[in-house]
Amino acid sequence: LKCNKLVPLAYKTCPAGKNLCYKMYMVANKKVPVKRGCIDVCPKKSLLVKYECCNTDRCN
């Protein structure tokens, strides 16, 4: 699985066990992602941050 990094056009290959890509946003500003990468379990959203997870190459 390949997941996008925060830097445009950059991505990384996920290590074994991390089979989801994620994008993290601040709830106050949903247009600008704060963090992107590989993860094993999609975190729950909170009052301040929202996560979007997916399982195809560079889907984040």
UniProtKB/Swiss-Prot annotation:
The lineage of its organism: Eukaryota, Metazoa, Chordata, Craniata, Vertebrata. Monomer in solution; Homodimer and oligomer (homohexamer) in the presence of negatively charged lipids forming a pore with a size ranging between 20 and 30 Angstroms. SUPFAM superfamilies: Snake toxin-like. PROSITE patterns: SNAKE_TOXIN. Belongs to the three-finger toxin family. Short-chain subfamily. Type IA cytotoxin sub-subfamily. Shows cytolytic activity on many different cells by forming pore in lipid membranes. In vivo, increases heart rate or kill the animal by cardiac arrest. In addition, it binds to heparin with high affinity, interacts with Kv channel-interacting protein 1 (KCNIP1) in a calcium-independent manner, and binds to integrin alpha-V/beta-3 (ITGAV/ITGB3) with moderate affinity. It is found in: Secreted; Target cell membrane. Disulfide bonds join 3-21, 14-38, 42-53, 54-59. Expressed by the venom gland. It comes from Naja sagittifera (Andaman cobra). Keywords: Cardiotoxin, Cytolysis, Disulfide bond, Membrane, Secreted, Target cell membrane, Target membrane, Toxin. This is Cytotoxin sagitoxin. GO terms for cellular component: extracellular region; membrane; other organism cell membrane. Its main location: secreted. CDD domains: TFP_snake_toxin. One of its GO terms (molecular function) is toxin activity. One of its GO terms (biological process) is killing of cells of another organism.
